[in-house]
Amino acid sequence: MTPTASSRDASYVLTLEEIGNLAKNAGKPAETLMNVVALIAKRFQTDVCSAYLLEPDRANLVLAATVGLRPQCIGTLRLALHEGLAGLVAEQVRPVAVEQVKTHPRFKYFREAGEDAYQSFLGVPLIDRGVLQGVLVVQTMAARAFLDEEVRMLTEAAAQVAPVVSEARTLDRFIAPSQERLWSLARNLWWSWDQESSGLFLDLDPKRWRQLNHNPISVLGEIPMSQIERRSGELVLHGRINYAYRRQREYLNADRTWGARHAGILRPRPVAYFSAEFGLHESVPIYSGGLGILAGDHLKSASDLGIPLVGVGLFYGQGYFRQHLDGNGWQLEEYLQTDVSQLPMEAAIGTDGAPVMVQIETRGGAIRAKVWRLKVGRCDLLLLDSNVEGNAPEDRELTSRLYGGDGRVRVRQELLLGVGGFRALRAMGVTPGVLHLNEGHSGFAVLEAIRSRMQDEGIGFDAAATRVSREVIFTTHTPVPAGHDRFGADLIEEHLGPLRESLGLSHEGLMAIGQEHPGNGEDFCMTVLGLKLSRRANAVSALHGEVSREMWAGLRPGKSEEAVRIGHITNGVHVPTWLAPQMSRLYDRHLGAGWHEHSAEARIWEGIENVDDGELWETHLSLKSRLLDFVRRRAMDQAERRSEPRGAILRLGGVLSPDALTIGFARRFATYKRANLILADIEKLALMVNDPKRPVQFVFAGKAHPHDEWGKRVLQQIAELMRNAQFADKFVFVEDYDINVGRHFVQGVDVWLNNPRRPLEASGTSGQKVVLNGGLNLSVPDGWWAEAYDGLNGFAIGTGRTHSNMNVHDTRDGDDLYRTLREEVIPLYYERDHDGLPRGWIKRMKRAIRTLGWRFNADRMVMDYTLKCYVPAAGGTSSDMRMKL
């Protein structure tokens, strides 16, 4: 039966009012849901109205309430998102109306539901607070062409129903509360830095947890439902689930945060934080190295502090490469496709209720990208994905890998990140008050922001650029000129020509924005763009600030380096992410209640001096033992994969002594990091590692860029030591360096070795993670260590002298490294008292924790950005950090 035009509006409006009343006066959510679908069927004059809910795995729909279909199917009728018309609605997150269902290619007949009599179908998504909850469906026996107005009104009805559905999914009988709460924990990366939550997933199935790369969505998806039901019903585990879930809710809903007190101006217009990569957790492989890890830590601390901030990046379908070494120690690269269904991501929904899709015009055609949304605590991370229908094959591959391809691929990736990222924000109704560019890769976002301001306010380029630049923060990480992205004029015109025209700029005018000396034929430099179109620019350590001001002095010819107003905010690390559980419990006992929320305050860390030396040392030895077990296990797995003899595999199970001084090195095998500096004098090294009274051993990990032959040769040098009789038990290289490997290393080493060629390390953060866990740094005074080392909180390689001759520089540093090991590090480690404790070493551990723990953590870093950059850029109180004029 089709409603008449005269009855349609009144009946629909009444339906919306009554749905609101039902939701307001709800008893049990499931009962309310049944009443709602009955009311909709009556008012829309349809024969069927059904509500399908997404199951916790978000891969299937389950029939939750119906009028017209067989009631015994409630809770039992399931369909995957790729099945049927209801699945199509959920998959595309948009309404689907079909007059004759049997003619549609996605039609699927569910006999048990008794739906063979129904011909027409209208389904709309149920969305609550931007999250898809399920699908609302009406069906009729007679063929019916649903009008646009009817689709709109059912969509509005669904908006009223969605909150009821959201509550029902958690509380009602067809989805067990404990299971739903586990899925709720898994779908927000907050679990990754909450030790109680990650421990829950480990305890559900320890073997699967390790095999599935610590991915809770994969674990929950693979564990049989009966096992989850049985385990979650155990009294102790049930209580832990409820406790973790309650803490997550309290965390997400907290309003008394540091950000609420100090960054309220950002709430209506948040910070948009752009980065080419984000290192959040090993199970989300969209990072390659330090830049991504820093970005991930920045988001996590912004979440903890309550800073209104949205991350913007790219979704790399194959991530960075997986590393294996062949029998000769040569690096091999393998790229694996990431299964999106195993990640805690959902399609980003725009203000129009549809999935966000952005499009960027170039001279060669349009590039399109869909947008994923990932929850990082209180913060959203938007990830653009070019692997969509309608793109040319080369464009579908744009976001497949990090840092792959030539300059043409790179400029297209950066166009997608900057311009596409800004458009994605606007499509979601986010108008950022601050743009923070984490390196130059995202610099095109500023040009798009200027275009948008010109259009919104009806002003010209110069006026718009002036206004936008006040809101831009630019962070540079690269201390060498060759490391900055540069693109030729032809590439810029091919890809930015349409944008340039909308900005009202000539080709020369656009190129000048990215040239240090306009008009001399230079390529377009992304860092120059960032420096010119930002009010505030910063380096990432004090020394790096000096290097950057010298490097970019040409931007202010005739002025002193000090006139190049690049300030610095030294990097820090997210304490909960990198702190071992054992050390966290030790701090809980001795630093005072709530120390986590005040970790950027020096007074908190003074409590480390009250820790008993024996307790601290035993905690460290426990972590060291865990590291060595991990390294042995990985070494055996590597040998087995290479089909090495059984005896050789078993021998690896006994390498590395828990009593030996253990030095760790894990990072990119870039040339300037000099991973092989310790090999400068192989005879001295052999004597050192084989000293029967004071032995030293090394654990290494790291990746060389696929195109870096030098880096691969250095890596091979180190790997070959595992087959050298002099070093076989004292050197182990762990393949496939990732966040998991890094976490084990920084939590368990005695000494962290860092020997870059000064001043080429912008900051570095791995040594900061070591400090938190009781390890000591042995480093060239470069990057963060140049301002951190006080003579008693670690060890320095040399005095910071440099030399224009690289060979002289390296030889001098190599000699200083051996001398420091021989005269300072090794004697102090092995000097024991009558209790067997290295009191001098422990004293240095405590001093490192006390003097560095508060200074070099991401909470302090994000607080600095907020007070010195974000708030002033948004129009708040000015800062004392250097402002770029």
Residue ranges and their predicted role:
Residues 71-72, 99-120, 140:
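Signal-transducing coupling segments at domain and membrane junctions
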Residues 69, 135-144:
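Short beta-strand-to-loop transition segments that serve as allosteric relay/switch motifs
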Residues 23-64, 73, 83, 168:
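Helix-loop-beta substructure at the N-terminus of cytosolic sensory domains
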Residues 71-96:
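Acidic/proline- and glycine-rich, intrinsically disordered low-complexity segments
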Residues 119-127:
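A short, aliphatic-rich beta-strand micro-motif
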Residues 171-885:
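Catalytic cores of carbohydrate-active enzymes across secretory and cytosolic contexts
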Residues 1-31, 42, 133, 164-171:
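Signal-transmission linkers at sensory-effector interfaces
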Residues 155-162:
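Allosteric cytosolic regulatory segments
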